[in-house]
Amino acid sequence: MNTALAQQIANEGGVEAWMIAQQHKSLLRFLTCGSVDDGKSTLIGRLLHDTRQIYEDQLSSLHNDSKRHGTQGEKLDLALLVDGLQAEREQGITIDVAYRYFSTEKRKFIIADTPGHEQYTRNMATGASTCELAILLIDARKGVLDQTRRHSFISTLLGIKHLVVAINKMDLVDYSEKTFTRIREDYLTFAGQLPGNLDIRFVPLSALEGDNVASQSESMAWYSGPTLLEVLETVEIQRVVDAQPMRFPVQYVNRPNLDFRGYAGTLASGRVEVGQRVKVLPSGVESNVARIVTFDGDREEAFAGEAITLVLTDEIDISRGDLLLAADEALPAVQSASVDVVWMAEQPLSPGQSYDIKIAGKKTRARVDGIRYQVDINNLTQREVENLPLNGIGLVDLTFDEPLVLDRYQQNPVTGGLIFIDRLSNVTVGAGMVHEPVSQATAAPSEFSAFELELNALVRRHFPHWGARDLLGDK
């Protein structure tokens, strides 16, 4: 057993008391991102090492792996604690998203270590989708790079409001305050173009040497701010979903016997209580909440993020993908929306194409009506394009095969986030964040069917010499 863990258990008075104490700690999900070789995996390894989260057998294995795959000479290569794939260790880079868990006396943490290479941007977006804070690493020798801008933009696009800019490898620039100040000013100039009201903090550190990671650096007396760990332990995360109206997407209908019929899922936002009048969408049928069932018994109320089963007073038709909300709330179903898209497939996204989509447990089909623009990550400008390439980010107009109940992603990530699925391979090819649902009154009707639009796109792609016009060219 880890000696630090054994000491914590002893201090709490036993395993059971320690587990209860763990349950009451707040949880922070964060990711590390930045350009290639900025030291993301090394930083996570340093956090695990300095908070004494490494078991003795892991430490022994790390010594052996450092000799075989290490990139730090005689020193421990802490990045190997996180880079688990054989290809990652051989190349000295991160490819997949690696998740690690650790805790301190103040908080629990789940870390997502995301890849820095541009071709793995889709992996980074996957890691960011569940996080509340992003650590953006910048190599003190290189300053702000294109990939730093890309990751900053994706993080904010996915709703992350707390950014910690960790200026790493300060030991390689002689712990220069001038270098730190210059990079800080450069990043703030860029960050002024990012959307939203952001909480941005700066920490100069050396992940390799441990400066300002978990303890104050003696080499940077000019820096009087908190260490990285202190920032992580004290940052206050305001969850947007807590203040939003009730949203309960039904994941499945639970009917173990003839006497029980419940609707299971995770409360996406708001709160629900016994006796509350609720409405089922898209049908619009209303009922009252009779019971709120959880794994440890019935409750009188439940809050966002909790897995529950709702039992209603009436026997009504509800299936997977339906949405329950307060009966007095007017939320119309829509068949069109503008969506911010991060494209993850080799074949570009083009107007006229159709994909299966999944959103809040519901699966349906969507047609790409047009691409308004692609974002140039270097300067955050918008430019017109015919299609959206691999790792491209842009605003896309979609039309759905059936009415859907949507929220803007920034208001509710569960009912505003969707994925694109290729209909032939069943592979996830893109991630979407609802920018704005389009009401039926403002949606422009299409004079062409979905089949005609898809056939037109195929002809233009494979037989360009025919000179077929783009049926959506006026959009």
UniProtKB/Swiss-Prot annotation:
Residues 92-96 are annotated as: G2. Residues 34-41 are annotated as: G1. GO terms for biological process: hydrogen sulfide biosynthetic process; sulfate assimilation. Pfam families: GTP-eEF1A_C, GTP_EFTU. Residues 206-208 are annotated as: G5. It catalyses: sulfate + ATP + H(+) = adenosine 5'-phosphosulfate + diphosphate. Belongs to the TRAFAC class translation factor GTPase superfamily. Classic translation factor GTPase family. CysN/NodQ subfamily. This is Sulfate adenylyltransferase subunit 1. It comes from Escherichia coli (strain ATCC 8739 / DSM 1576 / NBRC 3972 / NCIMB 8545 / WDCM 00012 / Crooks).
